[in-house]
Amino acid sequence: MPVSLVIDNRQKQVEIEQKLIMLLEKAVITSLAYEGWDPDYEVSLSFVSNKEIQNLNRTYRGKDYATDVLSFPLVDDTDGFPMGEEKLLGDVVISVEKAVEQAKEYQHSFEREMGFLMVHSLFHLMGYDHLEETEAQEMRKREEIVLTEMGLVRE
């Protein structure tokens, strides 16, 4: 069974088109394939406003500001297999408002920014982090490989 992307659009600032959903599904498939993971996972993806992601960031991370993406893994870090019987990889929450801001700031397309945020979040769901510089470099390298494979190169 292919990857399942469960979408919850809770923002009204930007219309989420089917083309974008397909791109984000491709991000999931490509990221999992790059890591050699089975593609049979379900990922929950919520599109939210800056206000909502700030509330989530405060609640779950103790940081009182709007961030671009939050990742909530449902995979057991010790063995890489999902906890429970269902193959739920985790939840991704993207501030679409922040993605628009960052696309302008970095002077690339909204689609490239959303693709990057999805890939970045997926690597978190698969157990990667960027707390240490070496971890950050490794994660960034993997993200760039996946984004390049998807055709989402820096403009």
Swiss-Prot record:
Keywords: Cytoplasm, Endonuclease, Hydrolase, Metal-binding, Nuclease, Ribosome biogenesis, rRNA processing, Zinc
Cofactor: Zn(2+)
Keyword Transport in annotation: no
Protein known as: Endoribonuclease YbeY
Gene3D superfamilies in UniProt: Metalloproteases ('zincins'), catalytic domain
Family under the similarity heading: Belongs to the endoribonuclease YbeY family.
EC number: 3.1.-.-
Listed GO biological process terms: rRNA processing
Protein role: Single strand-specific metallo-endoribonuclease involved in late-stage 70S ribosome quality control and in maturation of the 3' terminus of the 16S rRNA.
A Pfam family recorded for this sequence: YbeY
Disulfide bond residue pairs: none
Compartments (UniProt record): Cytoplasm
GO cellular component: cytoplasm
Main location group: cytoplasm
UniProt-annotated binding residues for Zn(2+): H120, H124, H130
GO MF assignments: metalloendopeptidase activity; RNA endonuclease activity; zinc ion binding
Cofactor, free-text remark: Binds 1 zinc ion.
PANTHER family from the UniProt entry: ENDORIBONUCLEASE YBEY, CHLOROPLASTIC
